[in-house]
Swiss-Prot record:
One GO BP annotation of this record: ubiquinone biosynthetic process
Keywords in alphabetical order: Cell inner membrane, Cell membrane, Magnesium, Membrane, Transferase, Transmembrane, Transmembrane helix, Ubiquinone biosynthesis
GO CC, alphabetical: plasma membrane
Catalytic activity: all-trans-octaprenyl diphosphate + 4-hydroxybenzoate = 4-hydroxy-3-(all-trans-octaprenyl)benzoate + diphosphate
UniProt subcellular location: Cell inner membrane
Protein name: 4-hydroxybenzoate octaprenyltransferase
HAMAP family given in the database record: UbiA (MF_01635)
Residue intervals passing through the bilayer: 21-39, 95-115, 118-138, 140-160, 164-184, 209-229, 233-253, 262-282
Organism: Verminephrobacter eiseniae (strain EF01-2)
Length: 295
């Protein structure tokens, strides 16, 4: 290992997981899907830019808070032992300052939308801050993560329509099951370490039912999205995308069924493609409809 000191920029990029995009991509695809549904098609460049940048920035801010909250646990977990806050390369106050700056940048983006979005951004921020501490209090902290990650859906409808209709909450609930699925896969990677240090996760709570529960969550996620959007008459592309997403879920079963660290981590890292597939089906369906109506 090189003894050359790392630059602050390098440490900050490591702190916010800049080189590991899977974490913000799983937040981004449901948010973009909600934007398209709320706008009944392309939402416009302004909102697209706000939500793409906002998702990336807030996920990065969340990493700062998470690493501060978990610093005493992370040093005992092989995967997280070298995180900047855990090693002391970035101080606690410094990490929180980075997170605060990022949160302010995200709020600046929200201010360019409307009053409803601004109002909903407050509970979104509070839940994001609360999640890292949920692992000490609840047996399924992934549900709290789901609430935090899924606020993008709520904010998308608020930004487009100025309200959050029932369909948004059905999509929110469906995506909750997706978060439970992929973050349980993630938790399975660290299960042995988490048992030793007393962290609560869905992988520990579910025990030998973990794989079955994950597959059920994938099924509920896709089923609820189909049910919520069936009245939108999105057409064949949407259902082809849902079928492709289901095929990916079955592939994940092959990756996680032996419960190996490598298999579970691989399943988590490619999960964003499942969300991307659903978004592609939705965006493609609206594009086809637009072309047909103007053809």
């Amino acid at each position: 290992m090189s003894g050359t000191p790392r630059s602050r920029l390098s440490l900050y990029l490591d702190l916010i997981r800049w080189n590991r995009p899977a974490g913000w991509l799983v937040c981004l695809w449901p948010t973009l899907s909600a934007l398209w549904v709320a706008a009944d098609g392309f939402p416009g460049w302004h909102l697209l830019l706000v939500f793409v940048l906002g998702t990336c920035i807030m996920r990065s801010a969340g990493c700062c808070v998470n690493d501060v909250a978990d610093r005493d646990f992370d040093r005992h977990v092989k995967r997280t032992a070298q995180r900047p806050v855990t090693t002391g390369a970035v101080g606690v106050k410094e990490a929180l300052a980075v997170g605060a700056v990022l949160a302010l940048l995200a709020f600046g983006l929200v201010l360019s939308t409307n009053a409803a979005t601004i109002a909903w951004s407050v509970p979104a921020l509070l839940v994001a801050i609360a999640y890292p501490y949920a692992k000490r209090l609840v047996s399924m902290p992934q549900t709290v993560l789901g609430i935090a990650f899924n606020f993008g859906i709520v904010l998308a409808f608020a930004a487009v329509q100025g309200r959050v209709p029932a369909v948004a909450w059905w999509l929110w609930l469906g995506t909750m099951f997706w978060v439970l699925a992929y973050d349980t896969e993630y938790a399975m990677v660290d299960r042995d370490d988490d048992l030793k240090i007393g962290i609560k996760t869905s992988a520990i709570t579910l025990g030998r039912l973990d794989v079955a529960a994950i597959m059920l969550c994938y099924l509920l996620f896709l089923s609820l999205w189909v049910w919520a959007l069936h009245s939108r008459a999105l057409g064949a592309l949407f259902y082809i995308a849902i079928a492709a997403a289901l095929a990916q879920a079955l592939w994940h079963w092959r990756l996680i069924r032996q419960r190996t660290r490598a298999g579970c981590f691989a399943a988590f890292r490619v999960n964003h493609w499942l969300g991307c597939t659903v978004f592609a089906g939705i965006a493609g369906s609206y594009l086809v409809r637009h072309l047909q109506s103007n053809g």
